[in-house]
Amino acid sequence: MTIITKHASARAALHAGHASSRPLSEGYENVGLAGEFEFGRFCGQMPDLSERPAGDKGVDFVVPLLYTVDVKTARKAHNLIHEASKPLAADIYVLAEYGEDDEAKLVGWVWRAALAKADIKDFGHGIDNRYIPREMLRPMEELGRRIWRHR
């Protein structure tokens, strides 16, 4: 069992039955944690693996710029999506794509202000989401330059 699988199983058990938990696919927590680990490799930080019964309040990382980051990971990462009814808590939103190899690849990112202005759509689960197509995201190299410049 990998560290991701171990912590994903613990998170799934911790959040089972919670109103805010939306496991829309098999291995939902594993997919999300894989994206967080990949972003952690990108920025030189470990994901926060502490048990948080109330969730992470929409913030996965605080990078050296003191900007907060929320990583959104999907198997089919056509769009960066964020549930429209939830507050946009992070400064930066990153899209990661989870592959058949159980690894995640970082796709791109946007500022909170851009996501706040994004169109809203229900992608078939009865939940309205703000979304930005992956082609419209900023390149990860740009975010990397911003992070590393301030270290």
Predicted regions and their residues:
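Nucleic-acid endonuclease domains
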Residues: 1-65, 71-151
